[in-house]
Amino acid sequence: MGKEADSKIRDFIGKVRKKYNINKAILFGSRARLDHFKNSDYDVILVSPNFRGIFFSERIAKMYDFWNHYPLEIEPLCYTPEEFKRKLKEHGIIRQAVREGIEI
């Protein structure tokens, strides 16, 4: 991960971690593999107990509110700890993200 990208995603994670009690944040995809293009998006999994009772789409919208001042796109996946545990068993992309991603 380049220094500029590193600071952007770490700044973002720091802000949402404080607001939503994020207990797991994983950068995955091309940014984590270091095979991204200049304008590639940031794929990130965020896990928080504070997401309970919030619709999945609303969680994502809330993350965009934190990201909107950065010039690049983000693709957040926001789960409760229980959802994350279940998705880890059900979805290959989540397993791959955990295996190949960078926990921040």
Task: List each model region and its residues.
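Short beta-strand->loop micro-motif that forms the acidic, two-metal-ion catalytic signature
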Residues: D43-V47
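Catalytic core of pol beta-like nucleotidyltransferases
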Residues: M1-K24, A32-K38, S48-I104
